[in-house]
Amino acid sequence: MATMNAVVYHGRGDVRFEKVTVPECGEGELRVKIDACAVCGSDQKTFLNGNPRMKPPIAMGHEFSGLIDTVGKSVRGFSAGDRVVMATSISCGECFYCRKGWSNLCVKLDPMGFSYPGGMAEYVIIPEIAIRNGHVVKVPEGIKPEHAALAEPVSCAVNAAENCRITEGDTVVVVGAGPLGVMNLFVAREYGAAKLILAQREGKRLDLAKGFDCDRLVNTTKENLVEVVRAETGGVGADVVIVAAPEAAVQEQSIDLARKKGRICLFASLP
Protein backbone atom coordinates (compact mmCIF):
# COMPACT_ATOMS: atom_id res chain seq x y z
CA MET A 1 0.00 0.00 0.00
CA ALA A 2 1.41 3.38 -1.03
CA THR A 3 2.42 5.82 1.68
CA MET A 4 2.99 9.56 1.89
CA ASN A 5 4.41 12.11 4.31
CA ALA A 6 2.05 14.01 6.61
CA VAL A 7 2.09 16.21 9.70
CA VAL A 8 -0.15 14.31 12.11
CA TYR A 9 -1.73 15.56 15.32
CA HIS A 10 -1.81 12.92 18.06
CA GLY A 11 -2.70 15.13 21.00
CA ARG A 12 -1.60 18.16 22.96
CA GLY A 13 2.12 18.75 22.39
CA ASP A 14 2.32 15.67 20.17
CA VAL A 15 2.55 16.46 16.45
CA ARG A 16 4.57 14.10 14.27
CA PHE A 17 5.97 14.10 10.75
CA GLU A 18 5.27 10.54 9.69
CA LYS A 19 4.28 8.14 6.96
CA VAL A 20 0.57 7.51 6.39
CA THR A 21 -1.39 5.67 3.74
CA VAL A 22 -2.16 7.58 0.54
CA PRO A 23 -5.96 8.07 0.59
CA GLU A 24 -8.13 6.61 -2.14
CA CYS A 25 -10.63 8.81 -3.96
CA GLY A 26 -14.28 7.88 -3.54
CA GLU A 27 -16.94 8.17 -6.22
CA GLY A 28 -18.14 11.61 -5.10
CA GLU A 29 -14.77 12.97 -3.98
CA LEU A 30 -11.70 14.75 -5.28
CA ARG A 31 -8.12 13.84 -4.48
CA VAL A 32 -5.74 16.80 -4.50
CA LYS A 33 -1.95 16.71 -4.65
CA ILE A 34 -0.88 19.43 -2.23
CA ASP A 35 1.88 21.84 -3.19
CA ALA A 36 1.38 24.56 -0.56
CA CYS A 37 -0.09 24.63 2.93
CA ALA A 38 0.18 27.51 5.39
CA VAL A 39 0.39 27.26 9.17
CA CYS A 40 -2.54 28.98 10.88
CA GLY A 41 -2.38 30.43 14.37
CA SER A 42 -5.00 27.86 15.33
CA ASP A 43 -2.56 25.10 14.35
CA GLN A 44 -0.01 26.50 16.78
CA LYS A 45 -2.63 26.82 19.52
CA THR A 46 -3.74 23.25 18.91
CA PHE A 47 -0.17 22.02 19.30
CA LEU A 48 0.39 23.99 22.50
CA ASN A 49 -3.00 23.61 24.17
CA GLY A 50 -4.84 20.78 22.43
CA ASN A 51 -8.22 21.16 20.76
CA PRO A 52 -11.43 19.27 21.65
CA ARG A 53 -12.60 19.59 18.03
CA MET A 54 -9.68 17.53 16.73
CA LYS A 55 -10.11 13.83 16.07
CA PRO A 56 -6.59 12.39 16.44
CA PRO A 57 -4.65 10.96 14.83
CA ILE A 58 -5.31 13.33 11.93
CA ALA A 59 -3.31 15.27 9.35
CA MET A 60 -3.36 18.97 10.19
CA GLY A 61 -3.68 21.98 7.87
CA HIS A 62 -6.62 23.89 6.44
CA GLU A 63 -4.95 26.67 4.41
CA PHE A 64 -3.85 24.75 1.35
CA SER A 65 -3.70 24.70 -2.42
CA GLY A 66 -3.05 21.90 -4.85
CA LEU A 67 -3.76 20.25 -8.18
CA ILE A 68 -6.60 17.78 -8.58
CA ASP A 69 -5.06 14.35 -8.99
CA THR A 70 -8.17 12.17 -9.22
CA VAL A 71 -11.82 13.01 -9.92
CA GLY A 72 -14.52 10.74 -8.51
CA LYS A 73 -16.84 9.17 -11.09
CA SER A 74 -19.90 11.15 -10.01
CA VAL A 75 -18.15 14.53 -9.69
CA ARG A 76 -18.91 17.16 -12.32
CA GLY A 77 -17.31 20.53 -13.00
CA PHE A 78 -13.74 19.59 -12.06
CA SER A 79 -10.91 17.99 -14.00
CA ALA A 80 -7.55 16.49 -13.18
CA GLY A 81 -4.96 19.25 -13.21
CA ASP A 82 -7.30 21.98 -11.94
CA ARG A 83 -5.76 24.05 -9.15
CA VAL A 84 -8.18 24.41 -6.26
CA VAL A 85 -8.52 25.91 -2.81
CA MET A 86 -11.25 25.43 -0.25
CA ALA A 87 -13.52 27.18 2.17
CA THR A 88 -12.33 24.58 4.60
CA SER A 89 -14.98 24.72 7.35
CA ILE A 90 -17.46 22.38 5.69
CA SER A 91 -21.12 23.18 6.31
CA CYS A 92 -23.93 20.64 6.49
CA GLY A 93 -26.18 22.45 4.00
CA GLU A 94 -29.30 21.49 5.95
CA CYS A 95 -29.48 23.38 9.26
CA PHE A 96 -31.40 26.62 9.85
CA TYR A 97 -28.35 28.79 9.12
CA CYS A 98 -27.31 26.91 5.98
CA ARG A 99 -30.84 27.23 4.59
CA LYS A 100 -30.63 30.98 5.23
CA GLY A 101 -27.40 31.13 3.23
CA TRP A 102 -25.26 31.70 6.34
CA SER A 103 -23.14 28.58 5.98
CA ASN A 104 -20.35 30.07 8.10
CA LEU A 105 -22.75 29.85 11.06
CA CYS A 106 -23.62 26.19 10.43
CA VAL A 107 -24.23 24.28 13.65
CA LYS A 108 -22.44 21.21 12.28
CA LEU A 109 -19.25 22.70 10.80
CA ASP A 110 -16.62 20.06 10.08
CA PRO A 111 -13.30 21.72 9.16
CA MET A 112 -10.52 20.17 7.14
CA GLY A 113 -7.60 19.37 9.40
CA PHE A 114 -9.98 18.98 12.35
CA SER A 115 -12.79 16.63 11.34
CA TYR A 116 -11.29 15.55 8.01
CA PRO A 117 -7.58 14.94 7.26
CA GLY A 118 -6.02 18.24 6.23
CA GLY A 119 -3.51 19.69 3.82
CA MET A 120 -0.25 19.10 5.69
CA ALA A 121 0.20 15.98 3.60
CA GLU A 122 1.14 15.06 0.07
CA TYR A 123 -2.48 14.30 -0.83
CA VAL A 124 -5.84 15.26 0.62
CA ILE A 125 -9.35 14.00 -0.07
CA ILE A 126 -12.04 16.65 -0.51
CA PRO A 127 -15.25 15.02 0.71
CA GLU A 128 -18.44 14.86 -1.31
CA ILE A 129 -20.34 17.18 1.05
CA ALA A 130 -17.73 19.91 0.52
CA ILE A 131 -18.09 19.70 -3.25
CA ARG A 132 -21.89 19.59 -3.07
CA ASN A 133 -22.08 22.63 -0.79
CA GLY A 134 -19.75 24.78 -2.87
CA HIS A 135 -16.63 24.74 -0.71
CA VAL A 136 -14.20 24.04 -3.56
CA VAL A 137 -12.95 26.94 -5.69
CA LYS A 138 -10.84 26.82 -8.85
CA VAL A 139 -7.76 29.05 -8.88
CA PRO A 140 -7.08 31.18 -11.99
CA GLU A 141 -3.93 30.40 -13.93
CA GLY A 142 -0.82 32.35 -13.07
CA ILE A 143 -1.31 32.41 -9.29
CA LYS A 144 1.54 30.85 -7.35
CA PRO A 145 0.67 27.89 -5.10
CA GLU A 146 1.93 29.64 -1.97
CA HIS A 147 -0.26 32.64 -2.77
CA ALA A 148 -3.31 30.51 -3.52
CA ALA A 149 -2.92 28.78 -0.15
CA LEU A 150 -3.57 32.14 1.51
CA ALA A 151 -7.05 32.40 -0.03
CA GLU A 152 -8.64 31.09 3.16
CA PRO A 153 -7.10 33.64 5.58
CA VAL A 154 -7.53 36.47 3.06
CA SER A 155 -11.22 35.56 2.80
CA CYS A 156 -11.45 36.10 6.56
CA ALA A 157 -10.08 39.63 6.10
CA VAL A 158 -12.57 40.23 3.28
CA ASN A 159 -15.35 39.07 5.60
CA ALA A 160 -14.16 41.57 8.22
CA ALA A 161 -14.13 44.40 5.68
CA GLU A 162 -17.64 43.56 4.52
CA ASN A 163 -19.06 43.18 8.02
CA CYS A 164 -17.44 46.47 9.04
CA ARG A 165 -18.81 48.09 5.87
CA ILE A 166 -15.48 49.67 4.96
CA THR A 167 -16.11 52.27 2.28
CA GLU A 168 -14.17 54.94 0.40
CA GLY A 169 -12.82 57.64 2.65
CA ASP A 170 -12.85 55.63 5.88
CA THR A 171 -10.11 55.81 8.48
CA VAL A 172 -9.28 52.27 9.53
CA VAL A 173 -7.15 51.26 12.52
CA VAL A 174 -5.64 47.77 12.52
CA VAL A 175 -4.17 46.69 15.84
CA GLY A 176 -1.62 43.91 15.45
CA ALA A 177 0.91 43.65 12.60
CA GLY A 178 1.02 39.88 12.35
CA PRO A 179 0.17 38.11 9.08
CA LEU A 180 -3.60 38.50 9.54
CA GLY A 181 -3.29 42.11 10.66
CA VAL A 182 -1.34 42.91 7.51
CA MET A 183 -3.90 41.07 5.36
CA ASN A 184 -6.64 43.18 6.94
CA LEU A 185 -4.59 46.28 6.15
CA PHE A 186 -4.28 45.39 2.47
CA VAL A 187 -7.94 44.41 2.14
CA ALA A 188 -9.09 47.64 3.82
CA ARG A 189 -7.11 49.61 1.25
CA GLU A 190 -8.71 47.66 -1.58
CA TYR A 191 -12.13 48.52 -0.13
CA GLY A 192 -11.33 52.23 -0.34
CA ALA A 193 -9.97 53.19 3.08
CA ALA A 194 -8.39 56.64 2.83
CA LYS A 195 -6.26 56.46 5.96
CA LEU A 196 -4.77 53.30 7.42
CA ILE A 197 -3.26 53.29 10.90
CA LEU A 198 -1.35 50.15 11.85
CA ALA A 199 -0.45 49.61 15.50
CA GLN A 200 2.10 47.18 16.89
CA ARG A 201 4.23 47.06 20.01
CA GLU A 202 8.00 47.14 19.69
CA GLY A 203 9.69 44.07 18.25
CA LYS A 204 10.33 42.17 15.04
CA ARG A 205 6.80 42.57 13.71
CA LEU A 206 7.02 46.34 14.09
CA ASP A 207 10.26 46.35 12.09
CA LEU A 208 8.67 44.27 9.33
CA ALA A 209 5.59 46.50 9.30
CA LYS A 210 7.66 49.48 8.18
CA GLY A 211 7.61 48.07 4.66
CA PHE A 212 3.83 47.87 4.40
CA ASP A 213 1.28 50.27 2.95
CA CYS A 214 -0.02 52.24 5.92
CA ASP A 215 -0.37 55.98 6.44
CA ARG A 216 0.65 55.90 10.09
CA LEU A 217 2.60 53.17 11.88
CA VAL A 218 2.23 53.38 15.65
CA ASN A 219 4.74 51.87 18.06
CA THR A 220 2.43 51.21 21.00
CA THR A 221 5.39 50.60 23.29
CA LYS A 222 6.32 54.28 22.98
CA GLU A 223 3.15 56.01 21.77
CA ASN A 224 -0.38 56.30 23.16
CA LEU A 225 -2.53 54.75 20.45
CA VAL A 226 -5.74 56.48 21.52
CA GLU A 227 -4.04 59.88 21.41
CA VAL A 228 -2.52 59.15 18.00
CA VAL A 229 -5.87 58.08 16.53
CA ARG A 230 -7.61 61.15 17.94
CA ALA A 231 -4.92 63.39 16.47
CA GLU A 232 -5.17 61.69 13.07
CA THR A 233 -8.98 62.03 12.97
CA GLY A 234 -9.49 65.55 14.28
CA GLY A 235 -10.52 64.22 17.67
CA VAL A 236 -13.35 62.10 16.25
CA GLY A 237 -11.96 58.56 16.25
CA ALA A 238 -11.66 55.91 13.56
CA ASP A 239 -14.52 54.78 11.35
CA VAL A 240 -13.39 51.17 11.69
CA VAL A 241 -11.15 49.39 14.21
CA ILE A 242 -9.94 45.86 13.49
CA VAL A 243 -8.27 44.12 16.42
CA ALA A 244 -5.93 41.44 15.09
CA ALA A 245 -4.33 40.73 18.46
CA PRO A 246 -5.81 38.27 20.98
CA GLU A 247 -5.36 40.50 24.01
CA ALA A 248 -8.19 41.58 26.30
CA ALA A 249 -6.71 45.02 27.02
CA VAL A 250 -6.42 45.83 23.32
CA GLN A 251 -9.92 44.58 22.61
CA GLU A 252 -11.27 46.80 25.38
CA GLN A 253 -9.25 49.75 24.09
CA SER A 254 -10.90 49.44 20.67
CA ILE A 255 -13.98 51.21 22.06
CA ASP A 256 -11.88 54.31 22.74
CA LEU A 257 -10.31 54.15 19.27
CA ALA A 258 -13.59 54.16 17.35
CA ARG A 259 -15.76 57.18 16.70
CA LYS A 260 -19.39 57.32 17.71
CA LYS A 261 -21.28 54.88 15.47
CA GLY A 262 -17.94 53.44 14.41
CA ARG A 263 -17.51 49.75 13.67
CA ILE A 264 -15.27 47.37 15.61
CA CYS A 265 -14.13 43.89 14.57
CA LEU A 266 -12.54 41.63 17.18
CA PHE A 267 -10.78 39.70 14.43
CA ALA A 268 -8.33 37.75 16.56
CA SER A 269 -9.59 35.04 18.84
CA LEU A 270 -10.29 35.91 22.45
CA PRO A 271 -7.39 35.47 24.91
Give short role names for the model-derived ranges:
Residues 1-65, 124-126, 130-133:
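Short N-terminal strand-loop motif that marks the start
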Residues 83, 141-223, 227:
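Mid-domain Rossmann-like dinucleotide-binding core that forms the NAD(H)/NADP(H) cofactor-binding site
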Residues 92-175:
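NAD(P)H dinucleotide-binding glycine-rich loop of Rossmann-like/cofactor-binding domains
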Residues 164, 207, 212-271:
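Glycine-rich cofactor phosphate-binding loops and adjacent beta1-alpha1 units
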Residues 23-37, 51-96, 137-142:
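Glycine-rich beta-strand-centered segment in the early N-terminal region that forms part
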Residues 65, 85, 173, 197, ...:
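Structural detector of well-ordered beta-strand residues that form the stable sheet scaffold
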Residues 84, 172, 237-241:
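Receiver (REC) domain switch-region micro-motif
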